[in-house]
Amino acid sequence: MTPRRSLSSSDSNDKSPSVSVVAKKARSESVEGIEKKTTPGRVKKIRSEVCTTIVKAGEFDSVALRKVNSLPSPNSEKSDTKTEQEVTIIENSKIPEEVKEFGVCQEMIVSAKSNENEQIDNGDQEIGDQDDYEEDGDEEEEREVEKKSVDVKEINVAKENRVGGVEIKKFSQFQNRTSPSPSSVRKISPPVIKRATSVYSAPPNSTSSTDRFAEQEDNFTHSQSKLQSLVDLVMWRDVSRSTLVFGFGTFLIISSSYANDLNFSFISVVAYMGLIYLGLMFVLKSLIHRGMVEEERHKVVGVREEDVKRMLRLIMPYLNESLHQLRALFSGDPSTTLKMGVVLFVLARCGSSITLWNLAKFGFLGAFTIPKIFISYSTHFSAYGNFWMRRFRDAWESCNHKKAVALALFTLVWNLSSVTARVWAAFMLLVAFRYYQHKMIWTTDQADDDEDDNEEEEAEEEKEQVPPKHKRAPPHMMMPNKLKKIS
């Protein structure tokens, strides 16, 4: 039996790690020596020397030796056990130019079966030679070697995941038997190689615009739902819940009105609460949790960023809605400015007699009564307002001395009012004048639009009333020869 050299390629779907095979100078010389030598003992000796040189150089990562029982040959008369020793050598090397071009690794298999071009003696006649007894006991067992193979797998290697060249050599030894079939040889699991991969971590603020829009929409709907629940409570849409809240608040207001001996300051309240908390903490630490004071000193005490964000998420919807309403009230529109000017002036003049507690009481009662009453009886209030406005307008139009009455009223108010009231009155007169101008412009524009609409409607009606004129058909010309038939 003679060794042979063959090339093989693995499938592209092979799960083994990508490796590249580069034949070192010493290893290539050893393989050529194996092919040229005739005795297996000499071949084994050369292989052992090469392995010893590689071990000393530190060129490979791991050496694995194991013995595997092989199947007996069908032509043999005795069933002898067959041992297989495989030496796996994995080492990093440089990638040759040919391998870099095609991105694959080559595989070389040297076995005991030789081709016609490469034949060597099997060495069966030299088993009993006296020169082999000079070697060690390991070399005596190696004389019985009949087959020697060097397998190097060919694996497609992805260029982007290539880490380095890896060379694998396998040496197998069998006793006096033919080489087993590939199915009888147990495959060695490939070594696990961890490759350095670049991991890209996306920045925290790299969210897409759609995600941000969806989050904003969810927050907006959530805030709208909260405001809607508050409106339902104030407008008595849920009667049981509104009754409970209004009754409890009214009870607290009435009970606090009769408790005259609860006159205290804010500083006194804070001081008393601090004393109570201090006493509770002293009792808790000294009696209940004794010995835990030193451990808790190292704990971080303070407000975390998550707590602040949570509080802001709760407050922001109400704050944004309040700012939106305030922006509408202070928009600068003449009609809105007249209403807000009167309300703010009254609050400014009477604010000294209004305390925070009184404002809270009147605000609570007004929130549960005024909106409901106004919405329920808005038609009646508008009817009464239009009636009295019509009466005052008729009285003013029927007055013969309008200028004198207006001058007398202005002089009386101006002399009885303070400087602040005079400034406010001048400002309100200017706003009223602008409101009158806007109203007149709006009425004229509306009248022009109404006239244009009326003219268009009249033109359409005239078009519909006038019947369309039918065109007369031209007279037909008849030839005499076509009117009469020849009898």
Swiss-Prot record:
Highest rank taxon of the organism: Eukaryota
Topological relation to the membrane, as annotated: Multi-pass membrane protein
Region named Disordered: 1-43, 65-86, 113-149, 446-487
Entry's transmembrane regions: 242-262, 264-284, 354-374, 413-433
Pfam families assigned: Reticulon
Disulfide bonds: none
Nucleotide-binding recorded as keyword: no
Record PANTHER family: RETICULON-LIKE PROTEIN B17, RETICULON-LIKE PROTEIN B21
Protein name stated in the entry: Reticulon-like protein B21
Provenance organism: Arabidopsis thaliana (Mouse-ear cress)
Upper taxonomic lineage: Eukaryota, Viridiplantae, Streptophyta, Embryophyta, Tracheophyta
